[in-house]
Amino acid sequence: MRHRQIAVRDTTLHVAEIGSGGTPVLLLHGWPEFWATWLPLMNRLHDQFHLIAPDLRGFGDSEKSAVPRSDVGANSHADDMAALLGALGLESVGVVGHDVGAYAAQALARRHPQLVDRLLFFNCPTASVGGAWVHHGHVNEVWYQSFQQLGLAEALVGTSRETCALYFRHFLEHWSHRKDAFEPAFELWIDNFMKPGNLRGGFDWYRSQNALRLAAIDGHPTPSVRIHQPTRVHWGRHDPILKSEWSAFVPEHFDDARISFCESAGHFVHVEAPDEAADVLAEFFGGR
């Protein structure tokens, strides 16, 4: 595993890479995650692909903002990734997105289509979800999206290692169908979020998405260009926060999307069912 700090635009991103041959594949993590969420796949596929796992702006070991920001949404992350690929000398890559990374991957395909050969998603939220965010039975799932925009959220969650662990254990267990999926790496997760600025970096995503999400809930989603690249979606059947039935919205945004489901996983298919996820990735990007 190689680790680098690479200057892009107005920030510096941490990038983990493994594998020197084969198709380059960019792995875009979600929240509450960072580059290491891809380790199960990187360990399985490094002999077939050049795997590139950055920490998104504000996450992991990438540069942090000194103050809360509300301008680091999907387009910002997409432009960061375009600059990163340029710095790495890569003209076109396969892209894997999950959660926040799924939004960023879609924005990358729309804003910089020449850089994206094909797309794989381990859940694929779209603007068409709209009012489903606050439907009966789901509204209680999204409380954290408002809480994390408050100034006190960072102070409360980061009061101590214990409070940080309590907070993130909730999401890693509740969103997983296999409840012990993150247990081997749990302390690494808390190490990550206890680093200065790492709570803020993740919370900034929700500040940045708030206006767009509220508009979509009100029936006014941001118009988007359809994505033409070949696309594969492998959604965890038991995902409680990005529900698998929302896969029905995917064809509204993609011209060439194949959708399947992981019956043994919730939100984190790549961690809960890594063998299956690795097989899907390898088949789609031509590794085996």
UniProtKB/Swiss-Prot annotation:
Outcome after substituting residue 103 to T: Large increase in catalytic activity toward (R)-styrene oxide while maintaining activity toward (R)-epichlorohydrin
Keyword flag Zinc-finger: no
Source domain of life: Bacteria
Keyword Hydrolase part of the UniProt annotation: yes
UniProt-listed InterPro entries: AB_hydrolase_1 (IPR000073), AB_hydrolase_fold (IPR029058), Epox_hydrolase-like (IPR000639)
Reaction equations catalysed: an epoxide + H2O = an ethanediol; (R)-epichlorohydrin + H2O = (R)-3-chloro-1,2-propanediol; (S)-epichlorohydrin + H2O = (S)-3-chloro-1,2-propanediol; 1,2-epoxy-9-decene + H2O = dec-9-ene-1,2-diol
UniProt keyword annotations, A-Z: Hydrolase
Active site as annotated: 99, 206, 267
Molecular-function GO term, any one: hydrolase activity
EC annotation from Swiss-Prot or TrEMBL: 3.3.2.10
Domain AB hydrolase-1: start-end pairs: 24-274
Family membership noted in the UniProt record: Belongs to the AB hydrolase superfamily. Epoxide hydrolase family.
Biological role stated in the UniProt entry: Catalyzes the hydrolysis of various epoxides into diols. In vitro, shows the strongest activity toward the linear aliphatic epoxide compounds, since it shows strong activity toward (R)-epichlorohydrin, (S)-epichlorohydrin, and 1,2-epoxy-9-decene, but very weak activity toward (R)-styrene oxide, (S)-styrene oxide, and 3,4-epoxy-1-cyclohexene.
Quaternary structure annotation from Swiss-Prot or TrEMBL: Homodimer.
Protein name: Epoxide hydrolase
Organism lineage string: Bacteria, Pseudomonadati, Pseudomonadota, Alphaproteobacteria, Hyphomicrobiales
